Every structure is written in structure tokens, then in C-alpha cells.
Amino acid sequence: TKKNLPQCLVICDDMADTGVMHQATNILATCFIRGRHLGLSTWLSVQKLSTIHPVARANFQFILCWELRNRKELFDGILFELSNIHSVDMLFELYKMATEDPHSFLYVNLRRKPVEFYVRFEEKLVID
């Protein structure tokens, strides 16, 4: 019989200045690459997507994006990162819909095929 692994969650908040976010051969990248095989989930909270190493970004299961103050970060970071899923224009419209209310955010479920977009966790955004 298959034995279930114990589950563990690691939450890292705003570690961009530590240097650990920028290296492919660090414990944080290992958490993303091998963690799921060990029953480990890793959540990152960052102000800039570009501070996360591409190896970690390639293993994201979801993205939560609140309203950003900087359009460059929005377009060069979030929207460009997701541009293989939909056009940047479409992604920008989804972002605007999801973040128009105070404290609201765009939830992108990258585990679903096709990828799903939500306003918070409440309202699914349907793309025609």
C-alpha cells in the first residue's frame, strides 16, 4: 500500500534582499524543484516577481497578484510571465477586473488546464 507523506508548508516573506532568491543552487530552489516529492509546499510573498529565480517561477502552482503601483513591474513581470497563456492585452483586462475593488486581487490557478483566473477566490473570470 502507498503511504501518505506528512505535509509541510514553508512560508517565506519578502526575502529578496537575502540573495537566496537569486541562486538556482539554494535551499529555496530545492524546495520548489523537489519539495512536492517530499510533501513540502513553499509559498513566497514578494514585492517583485523578478526577485524570484526562474527555476522557482517555473514550478509555481498559483499566483496571487494585488494592485501594483508600477506598470513596468506589472507588464514586465506578471503579464509577461503569463503571456504564453493569453495575450498581454487579455491578461491586463483580467488584472484590471480583479483588482478594481480595494484589497481585491487576481488569483491565477496554474495547476488547471486550461489555466483559470479568479477575482479573489470567489469569482471565476471566463474568457471567450
What are these regions (language model features)?
Residues 1-89:
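Conserved P-loop NTPase motor cores
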